[in-house]
Design a protein with these regions (language model features):
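Beta-rich interaction/scaffold domains
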Residues: 1-31
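The feature captures the LRR N-terminal capping module
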Residues: 29-53
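Hydrophobic alpha-helical membrane segments of integral membrane proteins
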Residues: 36, 530-531
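Structural signature of tandem-repeat unit edges
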Residues: 43-47, 61-75, 85-97, 106-118, ...
């Protein structure tokens, strides 16, 4: 008990000897405010709550290259420093709000916006001298905020969640950027940022069209959370060589057009791809894992001249120009394909053989100019479009299993073609086999109609069977300079000049007879053919 009393007494003595301290929040008086104004005569400011708002400055400051704001200023009103063309440096670290056009048309070089959480697009309008921006609290970059800032080189925006349309459009020197937490990037946001090299946007969930278009120095980009790439998002990124698209489900039109440095792609989850998505990607060699894609769009891989390997076994439809001018493509698996669009594989000069398996329709010019294509199995093909195999110069044989009509110019210029099995073909259209210079024999016994110039300039052709042919159109066999004898059999209609420039042709027969006739025509001495309906001379070899 005595010990306790001593402790209390000792504490009391200590307290009595300490100075008295009063805790209080000093309220700024009018006198204090006037004192601030007096000490800062070049700055006109007001007080609202806890904030000091700069309303204007003395005109003499317009001649200054550097201005030091009083450290108590927290907000700057509209147009305060507008057209201060000599201004290069100002301390803005404590500023949490800046008005419209506050620094427009100044020559500021660096922005440290440590306290700013919102920025109007006009605040720094026309400040083309800015080279560096640090704004750690900003969450949104509004549309066109830094558009055409041609000297901007470095940006740190670690807290930004959204970058809107045209935000950094044509910032041609922008090289370093920290936007690690951004989730959405607007249209054209970084288009023409020629110096941008590497970019991590792993948290981005959505990007808009053209957002990185023509970023010609961009080499690497990480976008693991993205599911969809819109139209022209990376078009013209000619240095891009490292991009992971494994999680991408949809790629828009022209998204990677003219990306010359892309070498390989893994498209494991891709379900939809737009027009010309990878056209003119000259360095692209390999495309893997197209397991979920059913259709290759128009011009999708047009002029990917290095493309050698691509698994197409799950593709059902190939659209117009899908692989046109892929001059290194050697093999194609058409396991599930039903149709092949116009010019889909035209000028694929390395292709040597094709098994069409389930293909039923081949479009116009589909394999035009495939100059090394030697073997074709038409299997279930029912329709071949115009010029489908135009100038396939190495093609040696063709077997038409289910085809009933050979279209206009379908095999024109197939100069190595020696064997054709026409099977059920009923009609051969205009110029279909013209300039097939190695053809020697034709069995056309099931063909009803032979079109204009169908076999024009087939210079080796010497034997033709047309026993059931009903119509032969203009110049059908013109220029067949090896043709010696021709039997019209039971033909019903002959058009003019069917044997024009057939210099070796000496004899025309009807059913084996030099003086034979059928229901429509008669031949005299194997030299002259007359139309029996009007006794007009149709062919004259004399």
């Amino acid at each position: 008990m005595k010990l306790k009393n001593k402790a209390i007494l000792f504490s009391t003595v200590i307290l009595m000897n300490l100075p008295l301290v009063t805790l209080s929040c000093k309220k700024i008086t009018n006198n204090d405010f006037e004192e601030l104004k007096k000490n800062n005569p070049n700055f006109n400011f007001i007080k609202e709550g806890i904030d000091y708002i700069l309303k204007s400055v003395d005109s003499s400051l317009k001649e200054k290259e550097e201005i030091n704001l009083p450290n108590f200023i927290t907000k700057i009103s509209d147009k305060v420093f507008k057209d201060f063309k000599k201004l290069r440096k100002i301390n803005l670290e404590n500023i949490k709000e800046i008005g419209k056009e506050a620094f427009s048309n100044t020559n500021l070089e660096e922005l440290k916006l440590d306290s700013l959480n919102k920025l109007d697009p006009s605040t720094f309008l026309g400040c083309k001298s800015i080279t560096k921006i640090n704004a750690p609290k900003l969450e949104t970059i509004e549309s066109k905020t830094f558009q055409n800032y041609e000297n901007l080189k470095e940006i740190s925006l670690e807290n930004v969640k959204e970058i809107k349309d045209y935000a950094f459009y044509a910032c041609k020197l922008l090289k370093k950027i920290n936007i690690d937490n951004v989730k959405k990037i607007g249209a054209y946001a970084f288009k023409y940022c020629y110096s941008l090299k590497n970019l991590n946007i792993d948290k981005v969930q959505k990007i808009e069209e053209y957002c990185f278009s023509s970023c010609t120095s961009l080499e690497k980009i990480s976008l693991s959370n993205l599911k969809e790439i819109p139209n022209e998002a990376f078009s013209g990124c000619t240095s891009l060589n490292n991009i992971d698209l494994k999680n991408i489900e949809k790629i828009g039109s022209y998204s990677f057009m003219n990306n010359k440095s892309l070498a390989s792609l893994d498209l494991s989850n891709l379900k939809e791809i737009g027009t010309s998505a990878f056209s003119n990607c000259y360095g692209l060699e390999t495309v893997q894992n197209l397991n979920k894609l059913k259709e290759i769009s128009e011009g999708c891989f047009y002029e990917c001249t290095s493309l050698k390997n691509i698994n197409l076994k799950n593709i059902e439809v190939f659209q117009l120009n899908a692989f046109s001018s892929c001059s290194s493509l050697e093999t194609i698996d058409f396991a599930k394909a039903k149709s092949i669009g116009n010019n889909a594989f035209s000028k694929c000069k390395a292709l040597t053989s094709i098994d069409f398996k389930n293909v039923e329709k081949i479009g116009n010019g589909a394999f035009l100019g495939c100059s090394n294509l030697k073997n074709i199995d038409f299997n279930n093909v029912k329709e071949i479009g115009q010029a489908a195999f135009y100038e396939c110069k190495a093609l040696t044989s063709v077997d038409f299993k289910k085809i009933e009509k050979v279209a206009n110019r379908a095999f024109i210029g197939c100069e190595s073609l020696t064997t054709i099995n026409f099977n059920n073909v009923k009609e051969i259209d205009e110029l279909a086999f013209s300039r097939c210079e190695s053809l020697t024999l034709l069995d056309l016994k099931n063909v009803k109609k032979i079109g204009k110039k169908a076999f024009w300039n087939c210079t080796a052709l010497s034997s033709i069977d047309i026993r059931n042919t009903e119509e032969i159109y203009d110049e059908a066999f013109s220029g067949c300079s090896s043709l010696v004898q021709f039997d019209l059999k039971n033909v019903k209609k002959i058009f003019k000049n069917i044997f024009l420039e057939c210099e070796a042709l000496k004899t025309i027969l009807i059913n084996g007879n030099k003086n034979g006739q059928n229901n429509n025509y008669k031949v005299i001495d194997g030299k002259q053919v007359y139309d029996k309906s009007n006794n007009s001379l149709i062919v004259d070899l004399s």
